[in-house]
Amino acid sequence: MKFAIVSATAAALLLSACTTNPYTGEQQVSKGLLGAGTGAAVGAAAGALLGHTTSLKTRKAALVGAGLGALAGGGIGMYMDNQEAKLRQRLANSGVSVTRVGDSNVLNMPSNITFDSDRSDVKPGFYDTLNSVAIVFQEYNQTLIDVVGHTDSDGSADYNGDLSRRRASSVARYLTAQQLDPNRFSVEGRGEEEPIATNASAEGKARNRRVEITIQPLT
């Protein structure tokens, strides 16, 4: 698990890049600034989400200490139900699936719509989808967000582990740039370790290449 730490310089860059969406009223980072090349710079300024391992307990403590209230009791299920409904509404026909697992919501982002082959930079055409995700994450901020990258079995295990980590980091960097608290996030790459389909077919390999985002309630 890794955190991003935003420096004063990074914060200035992000503030200068922020615009207000006229349709939603939400602030987001300018698409122009997040275009080819400059998108990577803003992502780096927002924090690389690299290497700092921390416990779930520590993440929760950081958020509660910053004034974010924890969910409790019967309100948890309703809160996550409402978040699920918003995610399904905003992500309809996007290619991203929404699955409810207990009190958590899981997003599956297939790599073919998120990244070019063997690349870890988010496709510009996927920015709008991530903006929609960020808007829901802003509204339902009493949640923790785990971003995990996965690959198929082609190539070496070391390469796949690194690629999956870089892809997960790219998605998390983009989302934290949309004024989301980095303390909510963890990032991990699991390479080819957790396939959801056979790697014996092209179709199965395509399903295995993905980034999954698990959103769990802050309790």
Enumerate the predicted regions with their spans.
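Periplasmic peptidoglycan-binding/anchoring modules of Gram-negative envelope and division proteins
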Residues: R90, T114-G149, T176, A206-N208, ...
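Periplasmic OmpA-like peptidoglycan-binding domain that tethers envelope proteins to the cell wall
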Residues: V148-L218
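Sec-dependent signal peptide recognition
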Residues: K2-A8
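Short, low-complexity, glycine-enriched hydrophobic/amphipathic alpha-helices that associate
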Residues: N21-K86
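C-terminal motif of bacterial Sec signal peptides marking the signal peptidase cleavage site
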Residues: L14-A17
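Amphipathic, membrane-active segments
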Residues: D81-N112
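Second-shell loop/turn segments in exported
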Residues: G73-G77, T114-V122, A157-N160
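Stable alpha-helical elements in mature extracytoplasmic
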Residues: A41, A45, Q83, L87, ...
